[in-house]
A protein has these predicted regions:
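A conserved helix-loop-beta module that forms one wall/lid of the active-site cleft
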Residues: 90-152
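ATP-binding N-terminal substructure of ATP-dependent carboxylate-amine bond-forming enzymes
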Residues: 1-94
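Active-site "cap" helix and flanking loop/linker of ATP-utilizing ligase/carboxylase catalytic domains
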Residues: 246-268, 285-353
Length: 421
């Protein structure tokens, strides 16, 4: 089989490594891929949002199955285009990817179908939003409606911060068109849990839960990032809570999308908060999370390609999705200065052991040398029988990844370890 994976980050590297385990897979093409993915797949310089380029490549190379991993191409209709060309895909069509593509859509969906979430207001007019903020409870959460690379959510601790966030998005177009509509919502408290789930639009098979570490600095200080590390499973996500989420959130979401004529097939990511009043949805993503994928897939015992094809074919109910009863920890090594400005182009060295455990995100290959090319450069994952061992081993392996100006949080997994006690 010839496979195509759209995307070029650490998440895609993890997906490709898992897909490679299937003996029927001959070749995997990554569009565009990156310098590290080039060790595991054939990288082709076609951008993830170049839909014409992707479709033409897939047709010319007789691709048997495609996986569209990032949010942008999904929201733009990459799966629709590939399907029209007769190529089966993993991922939702554009009319279902809107669940991530528009926060206003997803909030209204939850309200209409009684899915627990924070109370909210939606604004398309700056003056109205500012008037609302005069009396809104503080802290409050301001979200850009559209895609903003995971950076379009501001937790405003003061009224001034809320006004600044809304003005930045609506008047100063900080996120372009994505911020022309904003959602202002109630600030919720409680542990956060990420749950990725396979779905064929009928059956939902959740993956092992995980805990992300969003802030740039230790002890959750500093700016929000795309994620500095993850552990799985999440100790706060007990069997009782999992059952409740399936009944109150996962199945109702799939049913709601079906009722709206927007059947969702692929990976649906539930960003949850376990509030004193029960689990609530903070956000939906229409794809595998990054860096959640880097801990979830290494624990998957079932064959990934088989499960993906079952979501496409509507046979997920008859397909086993099994995870190892172990723990995983992923530690991100980033360029110092991320998520703001940082220098790139530094050579990366990895020990053999580190390379085998590392998914590459922001790196390019030049004359056989791997050079840093992004903020988050690598993610190094260890799997062990206990969380403490997985954390220790992930850091030990990550020490084998080196480049100038490298930066890691030193406390990935500590919150989870405390929760277990």
């Amino acid at each position: 089989m010839k496979l195509l994976v759209v995307g070029g980050g650490g998440r895609e590297h993890a997906i490709i490594r898992s897909l490679k385990k299937n003996p029927a897979v001959e070749t995997i093409y990554a569009l565009p891929g990156n310098g590290g993915i080039a060790q595991d797949a054939v990288c082709v310089n076609i951008g993830a949002t170049d839909l014409d380029g992707i479709v033409n490549f897939a047709k010319e190379n007789a691709i048997d199955y495609a996986v569209v991993a990032p949010d942008d191409p999904l929201v733009l209709g990459c799966v629709d285009r590939l399907n029209e060309a007769g190529i089966p895909c993993f991922g939702p069509r554009a009319n279902a990817a809107i669940i991530e593509g528009s926060k206003a859509f997803s909030k209204n969906l939850m309200k209409k179908y009684g899915i627990p979430t924070a109370s909210y207001e939606i604004f398309t007019d700056l003056e109205a939003a500012l008037r609302y903020l005069e009396t809104a409870p503080i802290p409050t959460v301001v979200k850009a409606d559209g895609l903003a690379l995971g950076k379009g959510v501001i937790i405003a601790q003061t009224r001034e911060e809320a006004v600044e966030a809304v003005t930045d998005m609506m008047a100063n177009a900080k996120f372009g068109k994505s911020g022309s509509t904003v959602v202002i919502e109630e600030f919720l408290t409680g542990p956060e849990v990420s749950v990725l789930a396979f779905t064929d639009g009928k059956t939902v098979k959740p993956m092992v839960s995980s805990m992300d570490h969003k802030r740039a600095g230790d002890n959750d200080t500093g700016l929000n990032t795309g994620g500095m590390g993850t552990v799985a499973p999440n100790p706060y996500y007990t069997d009782t809570i999992a059952e409740r989420c399936m009944k109150e959130i996962f199945l109702p979401t799939i049913a709601a999308m079906n009722a709206e004529g927007r059947t969702f097939k692929g990976c649906l990511y539930f960003g949850l908060m376990l509030t004193p009043k029960g689990p609530k949805v903070i956000e939906y993503n229409c794809r595998f999370g990054d860096p959640e994928t880097q801990v979830v897939l290494p624990l998957l015992e079932s064959d990934l390609l088989t499960v993906m094809q079952a979501t496409t074919n509507g046979t997920l109910a008859d397909t086993e999705v099994k995870f190892a009863d172990q723990h995983a920890c992923c530690v991100i090594t980033a360029s110092s200065g991320y998520p703001e400005s940082y220098k790139k182009g530094y050579p990366i060295t990895m020990t053999e052991k580190a390379a085998a455990a590392t998914f590459v995100a922001g790196a390019k290959l030049e004359n056989g040398t791997l050079l840093t090319s992004g903020g988050r450069v690598t993610g190094t994952t260890a799997v062990a029988d206990s969380l403490a061992e997985a954390v220790k081993e992930a850091y030990r392996l990550a020490d084998g990844v080196q480049f100038e100006n490298a930066y890691r949080r030193s406390d990935i997994g500590q919150k989870a370890l405390q929760a277990k006690q």
